[in-house]
Amino acid sequence: MACFATKQPLLLSLLLAIGFFVVAASAGNFYESFDITWGNGRANIFENGQLLTCTLDKVSGSGFQSKKEYLFGKIDMKLKLVAGNSAGTVTAYYLSSKGTAWDEIDFEFLGNRTGHPYTIHTNVFTGGKGDREMQFRLWFDPTADFHTYTVHWNPVNIIFLVDGIPIRVFKNNEKNGVAYPKNQPMRIYSSLWEADDWATEGGRVKIDWSNAPFKASYRNFNDQSSCSRTSSSKWVTCEPNSNSWMWTTLNPAQYGKMMWVQRDFMIYNYCTDFKRFPQGLPKECKL
């Protein structure tokens, strides 16, 4: 990735506006980094904090959230998705702020029947408004092993990556009147839940509870390239080498890989859905 240090004055103004200090961020284990928030025992941490699992049965799903809030960062998580007949299930992994005008950056993994591919559903919300969906298939089986899903969020762009391969970029086009998430710290959330009214083939394929409990697994959480704060902190802290990721965009090789993914594996792009937007596509689609 290329680094644009010439934008440091803008970075400084952003940091001072929120209240940043520059200190080292660290990748913690799941005990240190997350709280299990719901599921009544259906989410659990194992291996001295190195493995977390969420399960779903007919009574309830489960979920967890980060102890810290983030304002920009490169956040990695390895996931192994629900195997077998996962139709009607959703594994969500996203960042979100609070309030009615929230910001949000989404990965959602929509289950499918045995032998049929998962759908990766991505979205970006700004000020409580989303409608920026892009959906993809994967070029591997996401249930056979762990794979890395990354949100790289900085003042320039939001990059969605799978195993280091970019699949989508949402650029900061505020100068052209497009809102961009840059002022509201967000927590990381993840959950496994039932959504068979829409998740698989628009809700035509329902969940088969005879396959329960369904399980998604997590490893290797890494937030070492980030700016964050705890609930008890007023200030957001950045790791000292923040300039290595704070202004990065795709280099030509990475852009080429993203074009490969979007050509061969994208199945929905809101920027080409003219029926959905009869009054005209969203502004960022034309830039």
Swiss-Prot record:
It holds the Pfam family Glyco_hydro_16. One of its GO terms (molecular function) is polysaccharide binding. InterPro entries: Beta-glucanase/XTH (IPR044791), ConA-like_dom_sf (IPR013320), GH16 (IPR000757), GH16_AS (IPR008263), XET_C (IPR010713), XTH (IPR016455). Contains at least one intrachain disulfide bond essential for its enzymatic activity. N-glycosylated; not essential for its enzymatic activity. The active site is at residues 104, 108. Its EC number is 2.4.1.207. Belongs to the glycosyl hydrolase 16 family. XTH group 2 subfamily. Catalyzes xyloglucan endohydrolysis (XEH) and/or endotransglycosylation (XET). Cleaves and religates xyloglucan polymers, an essential constituent of the primary cell wall, and thereby participates in cell wall construction of growing tissues. Has some preference for non-fucosylated xyloglucan polymer. No apparent XEH activity in vitro. It is found in: Secreted, Cell wall; Secreted, Extracellular space, Apoplast. GO terms for cellular component: apoplast. Xyloglucan binds at residues 108, 121-123, 131-133, 197-198, 202, 276. The keyword Hydrolase applies. Residues 28-218 form the GH16 domain. It catalyses: breaks a beta-(1->4) bond in the backbone of a xyloglucan and transfers the xyloglucanyl segment on to O-4 of the non-reducing terminal glucose residue of an acceptor, which can be a xyloglucan or an oligosaccharide of xyloglucan. PROSITE patterns: GH16_1 (PS01034), GH16_2 (PS51762). Induction: Down-regulated by aluminum. Root specific. This is Xyloglucan endotransglucosylase/hydrolase protein 14. It comes from the Eukaryota. Residues 1-27 form the signal peptide. Keywords: Apoplast, Cell wall, Cell wall biogenesis/degradation, Disulfide bond, Glycoprotein, Glycosidase, Hydrolase, Secreted, Signal, Transferase. The record marks 106 as: Important for catalytic activity. CDD domains: GH16_XET. GO terms for biological process: cell wall biogenesis; cell wall organization; xyloglucan metabolic process. Its main location: secreted.
